[in-house]
Amino acid sequence: MKQYLELCRRIVDEGHWVENERTGKRCLTVINADLTYDVANNQFPLVTTRKSFWKAAVAELLGYIRGYDNAEDFRKLGTKTWDANANLNDAWLNNPYRKGEDDMGRVYGVQGRAWAKPDGGHIDQLRKIVDDLTRGVDDRGEILNFYNPGEFHMGCLRPCMYSHHFSLLGDTLYLNSTQRSCDVPLGLNFNMVQVYVFLAIMAQITGKKPGQAFHKIVNAHIYEDQLALMRDVQLKREPLQAPTFHINPEIKSLEDLETWVTLDDFWVEGYEHHDPIQYPFSV
């Protein structure tokens, strides 16, 4: 929680104003931020200076793991995070590759589970990583990559957190996640949860011990219409004790995650928080 608040304060105090062409808004921006999450000791990085809806973040991650490409499927899991980008993005609404209502195109999990090969067929990146780690293999390339410039025109949004690199030291699993862009007031509380949970769940299904998760953000920003709420409300609140995160121990394989797992298989204990803050969202 401390490192999250330090980043927010750094943006407010040291950020540069940048015009964002996609949203038509100005952003207060800093370059490069590094966050570390101690998964081994269950130090769950859930924001306490406002209420954080962690279940939606886990649901979104589960949708990526399953390779979903439709906002309706994400809603069924328990999150509406893709409704706007799938249905309110003018450029995507006029894109000939859009299949209809709720279609997201070839984004995130689609790339992770079905990366198109130039010579035909697809690569299931996640399956390969899970199989390797389960056998104790780390080829120094256990990388889940969502960033496919050749297919950007076939999806509603480029990936923000685009790379997850898993590494083994003995029987301890580590994760380095890289994010090109981060809406800090709205997106980062989701992204922190997802990086933490991804390492925790991958360690569990591959029979390894979780270590640390390292989260690099390249462009961290606060939109102009979010600044007052961050500076004058959230940053004036005292952080509270971190909660703990728990996963159903019966989840033992990638197939479990693909089939029967729901949000009921994850829970948080000891979450105390301040009141919610309604930050504006930019499509």
Curated annotation (Swiss-Prot):
InterPro entries: Thymidate_synth/dCMP_Mease, Thymidate_synth/dCMP_Mease_dom, Thymidate_synth/dCMP_Mease_sf, Thymidylate_synthase, Thymidylate_synthase_AS. (6R)-5,10-methylene-5,6,7,8-tetrahydrofolate binds at D183, S282. It catalyses: dUMP + (6R)-5,10-methylene-5,6,7,8-tetrahydrofolate = 7,8-dihydrofolate + dTMP. Gene3D superfamilies: Thymidylate synthase/dCMP hydroxymethylase domain. The keyword Transferase applies. Transmembrane segments: none annotated. The active site is at C160. Pfam families: Thymidylat_synt. The keyword Iron does not apply. GO terms for cellular component: cytosol. It is found in: Cytoplasm. One of its GO terms (biological process) is methylation. CDD domains: TS_Pyrimidine_HMase. Its EC number is 2.1.1.45. DUMP binds at R22, R180, S181, C182, D183, N191, H221, I222, Y223. Keywords: Cytoplasm, Methyltransferase, Nucleotide biosynthesis, Transferase. GO terms for molecular function: thymidylate synthase activity. Pathway: Pyrimidine metabolism; dTTP biosynthesis. Catalyzes the reductive methylation of 2'-deoxyuridine-5'-monophosphate (dUMP) to 2'-deoxythymidine-5'-monophosphate (dTMP) while utilizing 5,10-methylenetetrahydrofolate (mTHF) as the methyl donor and reductant in the reaction, yielding dihydrofolate (DHF) as a by-product. This enzymatic reaction provides an intracellular de novo source of dTMP, an essential precursor for DNA biosynthesis. PANTHER family: THYMIDYLATE SYNTHASE, THYMIDYLATE SYNTHASE 1. Belongs to the thymidylate synthase family. Bacterial-type ThyA subfamily. NCBIfam families: PRK01827.1-4, thym_sym. This is Thymidylate synthase. It comes from Vibrio vulnificus (strain CMCP6).
